[in-house]
Amino acid sequence: IYEPDPEPGRATLTGEPSLGTRCGYRKRGSSSGGFSKYAMALESWNEFNEDVDIKPLGFSAEGDWILNSRFTFDQSLMRNPFLYALSNQIDRWAVKTQFIEIFHDATGGDITASDYFGVYTFMEKIEPDKGRLDIPSVNAWDNSEPDVTGGYVFKRDRSGVGEQSLNAAGSGGAVPLTSPNIISTPQRDYIQGYLAEMNSALNAPNGISSTGKHFSEYMDVGAWIDNFWLNILAMDPDWGRLSQYFYKERNGPVSAGPIWDYDRTMGSDDSRDDNPRQWDTGNPTWYASNYPWFGKLFGFKSNNQPTPAASSTRPDVMQQVVDRWFELRAAEFGQSNMETIINGMADEIREAQARSFARWRNPAPGSISGQNFSEAGTTGWERDVSHLKGWLKARSEWIDQQFFLPPTFNKNGGVVEEGFQLTMNSNDATVYYMTDGSDPRAPGGGTAIGAIPFDVGPIDEVLLAADSSCQYFVPLDASLQTTWFLPEFEDTDWFSGTSGLGFESLNGPLNSHITTNIKTTIMPSAT
């Protein structure tokens, strides 16, 4: 491995390499292994052909690596690295990547210019490790709790060479186990039993299995939602049924992820992802019988795509799905951030891509299979990069339009000047708000008690004089709940006092601000 010299920013093949190692490699990829420019799995070896850890290109020490190629479908050369970077930005671990150029002598002899193999992505494998997917490994002797509970890595995919499969209830198909490599009978019984209970909870109308546990105790719902949106943003034709990873931490729930394999997405040359302004890619988005866990979690038994938020039988989960989309759109999924990632990657390979495409032209860069979203006047590889950015813009804006847009404020919090009036844009929908910090949406999707409908204009704020009279009550249980919010609530039996109202000890620092001290009301024996 030759790394660029920091000063000129270039690597030269006449000096000493940054790292040299023996290694073994094999072609990889269930559908791409037969390409002329093939991907490779790499193992670093010592002189005895034993695995040895190396630290190349600033990565953590490990012995298993991937040289990921792009021969067709992704002419930008960056769809995988882009989405992995986006996933890491939202704190969902994905493999780290680095663009490289390869000389590959597959026949023996001296390395010459004819051995140039083009631009590749050097990347990690998905495996438990402190420098990678940071969950404990399951060892052969981990056959009782808590050690038997994790970590496991499995996927919905075709089975790979030497991989064992789990009998996972409700998965819709094969579930190869990628870690541990060899599983004991107690370990298999544990993880299959856990997944069966999870599926039972998903099938139950109330979300509770026969064990009394809710599906949210079996699944990291937030991780499943983030994995869903990464896949749906990319419009992955294979998501959920191929290259769909899951992992279970020790004493923890099942998470969806890490994400994997996105060369046939985001307006690639695959054609199934040409149109960013639709949900489905030939495979359903919201429910599919061959990958039903996501659909069941979101409250679907069929692919109710026209109005998914309204069709769900789990409106609270679907509200989390919608809220998370707009949260991501305001930050990492914003067009500016996505283009910053793409532009940075494009700068890295702008010179190298020309050499790579001179070696491999299948198809030639700039040949877009569907609708063109690139800027006018761009050509070749620059057109592919521009198309990727334009496609993502069209995709994310279309998804925005499938849900009620959240209200916007003339200021999103912080210090304001005296006299400031808060206004809110309700986007032609009825918006409710609360003034006590609670959610105006009740569980199940109704309007919470005390929620105030917003009328266009400033929100009035009522200020009370410092010495206003007040009434107060110290509850002994939760029977009041929120009934005291209601205008008709009867409070004549409450104590009377003068504000400020507070709780403070005899010589406490807030005594000068408190006129009615309720400490002895709450704690009769207090002084």
State where each predicted segment sits.
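Short, compositionally stereotyped local motifs that mark structural "simplifiers"
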Residues: 371-468
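ATP-dependent phospho-/nucleotidyl transfer catalytic cores
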Residues: 53-56, 69-70, 122-234, 285
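Short, well-structured beta-strand/strand-turn elements
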Residues: 88-103, 236
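Conserved NTP-binding catalytic cores of kinases and kinase-like/nucleotidyltransferase enzymes
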Residues: 1-82
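Accessory carbohydrate-binding/adhesion or oligomerization-edge regions at the termini
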Residues: 455-509
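Active-site acidic catalytic loop and adjacent metal/ATP-binding pocket
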Residues: 42, 217-275
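Short beta-strands within extracellular/lumenal beta-sheet-rich domains
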Residues: 523-527
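C-terminal catalytic region of ATP-dependent kinase domains
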Residues: 192, 199, 251-403
